[in-house]
């Protein structure tokens, strides 16, 4: 058993002993290459070789697994046919209706078309916007595959498989670029398009004695006239544009639809064929009242298009204000 004296001596020696020697600091050059143990960054060449082989093998196998998984995934996809369509897709089976021109990008949430017909600079945004939107319809080369796939369709002459119907821009007059889309006459043209839904087949209102009660009277009369004179055109998705409220209906004035009052049925179903462009309807407001906001609602009419003003289903809303 140690004595008190021995304990004191041990404590004294421990307290006053020389601290352990620390390794000398290495210079940057020695950190890169240490000639004493022939190492690079603290590892020998053999150690670096083993680490390199491990990571090359690890990431090589990982990349191969990812490539195999991606290859298997893409085998389930078709570049032209969506995996999920109609009821199984997020888009659903009720196409929406869109309009052009749109307000400036800094006011993207607005639906107001407001300008002065007597000032070119004031309505220039709207006509330029239509120029940009309609460019693909005027120059087939802007749409891949359109130049060689165009087919002159008709109601009795649908497009063959792999070809697309031509959109005849000559039938839009006076809603043309050369005529400033009639904006300078305070009688603007608004273009309507139906959103594309792959595989959707419209169910037409093609009998004048079987039309919905809420269809505008003017459209009912139009369908009855088509039934008498051009029955082959009854397979059409009809279009109507009216004032939303009684005051709007009074102020909207006469409305003309070009080339016809709807989207021809031979453009459907949409099959994502190369070069396809959606058909358009030019809505020409011939005499809208100036100096007052006119709320306009346009609807697309087919048996399988549902309308809901609150949800904007099957219809589109915008306002006109011409000073």
Swiss-Prot record:
One GO BP annotation here? intracellular sodium ion homeostasis
UniProt entry keywords in alphabetical sequence? Cell membrane, Disulfide bond, Glycoprotein, Ion transport, Membrane, Potassium, Potassium transport, Signal-anchor, Sodium, Sodium transport, Sodium/potassium transport, Transmembrane, Transmembrane helix, Transport
Question: Which residue spans traverse the membrane?
Answer: 51-71
Q: What compartments host this protein?
A: Cell membrane
**Principal localization?**
membrane
GO (cellular component) term, any one: septate junction
State the family it belongs to. Belongs to the X(+)/potassium ATPases subunit beta family.
Record protein name field? Sodium/potassium-transporting ATPase subunit beta-2
Q: Organism, per UniProt?
A: Drosophila melanogaster (Fruit fly)
């Amino acid at each position: 058993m140690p004595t008190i004296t021995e304990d004191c001596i041990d404590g004294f020696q421990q307290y006053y002993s020389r601290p352990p020697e620390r390794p000398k600091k290495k210079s940057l050059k020695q950190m890169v290459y240490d000639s004493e143990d022939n190492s690079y960054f603290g590892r020998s060449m053999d150690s670096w070789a083993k680490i390199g082989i491990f990571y090359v093998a690890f990431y090589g196998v990982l990349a191969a697994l990812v490539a195999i998984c991606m290859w298997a995934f893409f085998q389930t996809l078709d570049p032209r046919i969506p995996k999920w369509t109609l009821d199984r897709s997020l888009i659903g089976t009720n196409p929406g209706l869109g309009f052009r021109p749109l307000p400036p990008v800094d006011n993207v949430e607005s639906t107001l078309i407001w300008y002065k017909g007597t000032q070119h600079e004031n309505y220039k945004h709207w006509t330029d916007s239509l120029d940009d939107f309609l460019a693909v319809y005027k120059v087939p080369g802007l749409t891949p595959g359109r130049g060689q796939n165009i087919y002159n369709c008709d109601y009795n002459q649908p497009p063959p498989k792999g070809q697309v119907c031509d959109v005849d821009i000559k039938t839009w007059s006076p809603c043309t670029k050369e005529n400033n889309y009639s904006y300078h006459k305070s009688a603007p043209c608004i273009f309507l398009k139906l959103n594309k839904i792959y595989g959707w087949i419209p169910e037409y209102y093609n009998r004048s004695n079987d039309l919905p009660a809420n269809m505008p009277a003017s459209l009912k009369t139009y369908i009855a006239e088509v039934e008498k004179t051009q029955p082959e055109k009854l397979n059409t998705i009809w279009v109507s544009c009216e004032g939303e409220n009684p005051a709007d209906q009074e102020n909207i004035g006469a409305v003309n639809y070009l080339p016809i009052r709807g989207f021809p049925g031979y453009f459907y179903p949409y099959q994502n064929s190369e070069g396809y462009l959606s058909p358009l309807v030019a809505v020409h407001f011939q005499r809208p009242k100036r100096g007052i906001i006119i709320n306009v609602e346009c609807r697309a009419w087919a048996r399988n298009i549902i309308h809901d003003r609150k949800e904007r289903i099957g219809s589109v809303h915008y306002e006109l204000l011409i000073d």
